[in-house]
Amino acid sequence: MATHPLQSDERGFREPKLSVIPSGSFLMGSHCGQDNERPVHRVHLDSFCLAKTQVTNLDYSVFLAAVSAPPPPFWNDVRFSLPEQPVVGVSWFEALRYCQWLATVTRKIYRLPTEAEWEYAARGNVEGAAFPWGDSAPTAQPRYAHRWLTGPEIVGQSQPNPFGLFEMCENVHEWCGDWFDPDYYLNSPELNPQGPGSGERRASRGGSWRHHIKISRCAARSSIPPSFQYADYGFRVACSL
């Protein structure tokens, strides 16, 4: 697939708004979660940037036009077609291709975040909390209680976490760069873990608009094969410093 660099004022291109995530260490995983969230272990990460919001339909439309690619499934479905809704139906390969295109356009190192980066960023420097706001259940939060949705919401509507990130644990599941291994934490390196070297499924994080409980715990892990295209799967970009 060819790429065609754009100027920032051409055809609606806009570079993602990024939060700088400071270097630091945190306890990754959960003593109270699923087996694949254990053992809880110390991780240290170098500083990186993460997009404040999930990639939107508007952002993705510029990419499609630039590389002459067909749209993903659900593109014309009215439940998912607002410009500022997160793009859905994007496979891991397509999310990676978007990052590669964005890197070409901006001459920066755009990529998908690792699982460790995602969890660290979602926690917002709040050590050990189950959710971005603390440990109280989602059903106790006015935004999340007793809501039925037919699609994802416009990005940037939630209260941002301490790192200035929106919808980190909700709206759509977000692809990560790692392969997925349920036992990876048993031997994960402490410094900048990148995930296993191979696998059959790619890691993802975050909650989903179509679940009864629409927000996930910060430590909750998920995965699907990288070719799958679901209506509650999207992504946000990271950028190396």
Predicted regions and their residues:
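Short, P/G- and charge-enriched loop/turn segments at secondary-structure junctions
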Residues: 5-8, 35-40, 221-226
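Functional-site microenvironments in short loops/helix caps that host divalent-cation chemistry
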Residues: 21, 27, 31-32, 70, ...
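Short, structured beta-strand segments at or near domain termini in extracellular proteins/domains
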Residues: 231-241
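Low-complexity, Gly/Pro
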Residues: 1-4, 8, 12-16, 59, ...
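Residues within well-ordered beta-strands of beta-sheet-rich folds
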Residues: 49-51, 101, 236-238
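A short glycine-rich, aromatic-capped structural motif
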Residues: 10-72, 90-93, 169-170, 177, ...
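Residue-level detector of short, conserved catalytic/binding motifs and their immediate flanks
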Residues: 41, 48, 163, 202, ...
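Generic detector of low-complexity/intrinsically disordered segments
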Residues: 1-3, 8, 20, 47, ...
